[in-house]
């Protein structure tokens, strides 16, 4: 990816860390709402949905295109949901200056299905996925680890981050439930016109 200048921003947990890119050290700066993104062409954001929503205006108000890796904007009609191999042209219509990408499972699936769709229109796909607890964040992973210990030690299992015990179990939930009892993840497709 061609880069003239690289700026790294992060949370208090990441601020101050140093990363090497093309032989040069870059320090992560603390992202704040008054940061100025003038002159920034593209901002890749992968800090979770709440951070994406909180800083979207800060990032885009001077023309930067925000490519968001969270679920924050996936259901928004005025934010294109793009998988470049399938619908790159949708990235050109971004009224809010934001481009979202679908869940990783969806991305892999639609890339594989695009050539089939070109040969014979697909009417419906039923998919079952098994998502990792890590997708729910560090606190959820800590809970899973603690639940595993509790089960193995014969202790009562404490549940906090998930609706049910996750250790040695599968629960029928991915993402946040909507009013019709489906989850947002079930609605992510590669194009807003197909949502």
Can you describe what each PLM-predicted range is?
Residues 169:
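ATP phosphate-binding P-loop of adenylate-forming
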